[in-house]
């Protein structure tokens, strides 16, 4: 079961790619994760999703928190950089940025979008093994995509451990997750898919926690899952944030707002995005912690 950005028939590519639901890749069977990700991201426009008005809420929220901890001269790492929306933004602000990305299609776009004045490098690699990077190097580490696509606790902890390893003591790590409840509400109940036995088999009948495997592409989390992952690490949580909160439940409304109303909506969003009674309903969640 996944929080999959599904291509929905009858709507534009930008609109459909921002729909969060679960789409089971029955045709891929047991294909390896790398091949699945290459096929998905080879036809998916992540950069334009973040540039759409509704997608910009997630981007602006993430950047708002990153900028709380940025200082001149800091080194930044983005693991799972995709096409470089965050890396390029930070490099153009004058920061030295290294990026790691698994999918070649994304790397090609990343390189095509790199300006001559950017101090940025990109490596092809896996979040679970950042062997090309040395310990205690970065002031800020962004892990904004890999946790979506890791399906075992061992793999998830490997990615977190690597991000922490390469971050300096007292550096700040930003780890993003897909939330369980948004998919349950919008897809399972909103589209009635929970009535289908295939999906019922993927959902705990008591807790309504969805399960995933690589063929389903996205892993879904609740806060208790994230808390369990973090127990082995010497870190201090700084913020636990819903980066889009209500936004993806009302994408069309957001996209049709005039500038003044959208600005007011952002003020509201920023006011509630750390509320512990609401964050669990967000499609995307950001765990921000300091390396002790």
List each model region and its residues.
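A C-terminal cap/extension of S-adenosyl-L-methionine-dependent methyltransferases
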Residues: 239-292
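Short alpha-helix
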Residues: 217-234, 240
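A short glycine-rich, Lys/Arg-flanked "PGG" loop and its adjoining helix->strand segment in the class I
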Residues: 157-169
């Amino acid at each position: 079961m996944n929080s999959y950005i599904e291509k929905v028939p009858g709507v534009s590519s930008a609109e459909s790619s921002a729909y969060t639901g679960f789409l089971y890749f029955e045709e891929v069977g047991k294909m390896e994760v790398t091949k699945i990700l290459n096929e998905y991201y080879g036809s998916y426009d992540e950069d334009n999703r973040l540039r759409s008005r509704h997608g910009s809420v997630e981007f602006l929220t993430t950047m708002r928190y990153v900028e709380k901890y940025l200082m001149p001269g800091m080194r930044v790492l983005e693991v799972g950089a995709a096409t470089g929306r965050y890396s390029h933004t930070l490099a153009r602000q004058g920061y030295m940025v290294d990026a790691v990305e698994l999918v070649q299609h994304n790397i090609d776009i990343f390189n095509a979008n790199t300006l001559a004045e950017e101090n940025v490098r990109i490596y092809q690699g896996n979040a679970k093994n950042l062997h090309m990077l040395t310990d205690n190097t970065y002031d800020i580490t962004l892990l904004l995509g890999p946790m979506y696509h890791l399906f075992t606790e061992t793999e998830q902890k490997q990615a977190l451990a690597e991000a922490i390893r390469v971050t300096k003591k007292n550096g700040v790590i930003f780890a993003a997750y897909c939330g369980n409840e948004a998919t349950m509400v919008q897809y399972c109940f909103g589209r009635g898919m929970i009535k289908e036995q295939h999906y019922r088999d993927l959902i705990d009948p008591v807790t309504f926690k969805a399960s995933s495997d690589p063929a389903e592409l996205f892993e879904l989390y609740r806060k208790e899952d994230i808390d369990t992952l973090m127990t082995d690490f010497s870190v201090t949580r700084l913020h636990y944030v819903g980066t889009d909160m209500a936004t993806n439940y009302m994408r069309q409304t957001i996209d049709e707002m005039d500038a003044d109303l959208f600005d007011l909506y952002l003020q509201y969003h920023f006011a509630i995005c750390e509320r512990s009674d609401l964050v669990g309903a967000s499609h995307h969640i950001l765990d921000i912690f300091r390396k002790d």
